Amino acid sequence: MAECFRLVLIGKMATGKKKIMIVAGEASGDLHGSRVVEALTRLNPELHVYGVGSERLRRAGAEMIADSSELSVVGITEVFARMGNLLEAYWQVKKFIQRSGLSLLILIDFPDFNLLLARAANGVGVPILYYISPQVWAWRSGRVKTIARRVKKIAVIFSFEVSIYKNAGLDVEFVGHPLLDLLGSNQQDLYIHEKMEGDPLVALLPGSRPGEVQRLLPEMVQAAKILTAAKPGARFILPMAPTVKVQELEKFLPHDSVPISVVEGKTYEALMAADLAVVASGTATLETAILGKPMVIAYRVSPLSYWVGRAMVKVDWVGLVNIVAGRKVVPELLQGEARGERIAAEVLRILDDEPYRKEMLGGLAEVREKLGTPGAAERVARMALEMIRNKG
């Protein structure tokens, strides 16, 4: 466990520079955080940025304090299984915050972990910018009061979140959804499309957490087998999340005639090339929607996690696409419904039923409109620099 985290030696810290720490606990946060780091260092090359995240933050230029790849979990029982890792990371990062003389702490999503860090930062007078806020509109709305006490400013990615935080007295700004920033940099890469052109292509996105992959990928593979029998020309592409090891995928993949190609680091290219996607619930549903691809949402957690979630969650849908739309735009297969036969049936309906597919595409266009305009990372970076200037 200890090798997952690396505390920077205090004596080697950057001196004479403004210092920012950015904390991202999951693959999506690592991605969006990396864009903020790039914008920050472009706008102010004199900044020194520390990071808690994974490979993308590192590549963007952050000096890594801890690797978050072992922290990402989904569900109540999964949290208990990783509690040792979470606590080890928390104590090390807290210690760093207390000693480092940060000018600003930027927190990205990952609320239970990050709100604890926020309290530690409050104790040493480090201002906090929260980017991609906790989904208080879905569950545990009482966290709004905690956020209002601990966070100086919040950058939200859904327009309907503004009123929630304003009513709590928070300084809040809608910056647009960060996924919109990714379109221009990915649309020109046609390698996968040229490779697969002419065949029905289905993207399989089983999630960015090991637990998700373990529960969903076997059912997606079973669906692929059924679809191959129904559509002999069908092909499948599985973009691998950076937080998932290839060994975790290989044990679930068939070694027979089902044509599943695994690619690394090309999620958006894979989605652009695909005719549709089977997607684990979460941010990936919005990625798929922004790229205008029909989808089937599959969702599985432990029975206890699901039971607790259903008792606490206040929204009607699991998928962010449907939540943003305020209605059912794409099908959701939850728990026992997320099995190969049902997934295959929904995929076939999208492929074969043109009116149904067109109606879904219209709904996805509405969702994209509600997500704002590109430039979220730049806006967040400018907010951060303004907060540092105001701090003095």
Question: Where in the sequence are the language-model features?
Answer:
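Nucleotide-activated sugar donor-binding and catalytic core shared by glycosyltransferases
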Residues: 3-4, 9-392
